[in-house]
Amino acid sequence: FDEKIVPLMVEENRLVTEYGKLKASAKIEFDGQILNLAEIARICECQDRQKRKAASEAKYAWYESHESRFDEIYDRMVRVRTEMAHMLGYKDYVELGYYRMNRLDYNREMVAGYRKQILDYVTPLACRIYDRQKERVGYDRLEYYDLAYQFDSGNPIPKGSAEDLVEAAVNMYHEMSPETAEFIDMMKNDELWDLIARPNKEMGGYETEIPEYKSQFIFSNFNGTS
């Protein structure tokens, strides 16, 4: 770390935030509803193939309509991170990125070898898995909108509402031990999670720690898929 890159780190953080806000702003009109990216993802896995296709096309049409903004954010991020690396004496951002993520036990040459192994061994395996999926769902050919569809009877879905799932989790932790019961009650009572997909909510999910409170915070986008 060097204080001279602080302005670049601020700009980097601003671009990450801008990217998240852009994806959270998605309003996709589909089947009489206005959906965000997390919500339309559920329809992209539904049993109706034509509906899956239409939902996927609507989702990617939104991305296409915002292509210039995504490109601009990406371009600015590459420039910021490259400048950051150069200021710290690195050839490019790759090596610096490894250090920033504490990836100290391998380097870019090892990763290049790993990519080659993926191509040689994992890709053929993935193709065989897709062939089995194609037979399982009864299609002659898998299209891009079929890849998330795993079973002819429909993909598994959570049993019950989001509230039911939370209550089941609370009960499970109560059955495990008094300590886990106390902890999950604290998280529930202090609202230390934000779980359900809603308009203008950032995509994705994560768990992070709040050390000064000796607690975690959980962020996710429950959307009716498993």
Describe the role of every protein-language-model region.
Residues 1-156, 166-168:
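A well-structured
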Residues 38-50, 160-225:
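Active-site-adjacent "gating/activation" loops or surface patches in catalytic cores
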